[in-house]
Amino acid sequence: AAYSRAELKALCDVLMRHDHVWIMTDDMYEHVIYDDFEFSTPAELEPGLHDRTITLNGVSKAYSMTGWRLGYGAGPVELIKAMVVVQSQSSTHTSSISQAAAVEALNGPQDFIAPHNDMFRERRDLVVSMLNQADGIKCLKPEGAFYVYPSCAGTLGKTAPDGTKIETDSDFCTYLLESEGVAVVPGVAFG
């Protein structure tokens, strides 16, 4: 869910050699981090990338405003101007009350974020622990966000107790939904 500073710096080093590549970061989970993870951005780690980096963020995750569809971007002026043109022709503005709430969320006290992250971390630890106890499932512990991305590779080619043959991650997800009532998204959906 997150790149360490060292991983991101290594990626920045590669990007510095390819000045035709633009960078777009999705920093929506900037504040939803765990285990002393240190958030960073390409433009911060490599100032030479600043002029070709667009940073996208919003209030959905850290401020529990999902569904409000409030976000913002920062980057080179010409790119932001182009975004404004596209946005003005493809969608209407966000409601004024949502905009006012977002301003208050961003400018108001931030002391609730740490307790929320503690709660998310406890849930993450429980889910990852339980997944890693399941036969055929392996799950790394993410350092940010509130999702996990377990591998079900150990279940492929096997037959479930009800006789269902599990050949793909989609088969596994369908089995979980139909037999256990658990809805998950297969990895194939993410490319």
Where are these predicted regions, by residue range?
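PLP-dependent class I/II
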Residues: 1-191
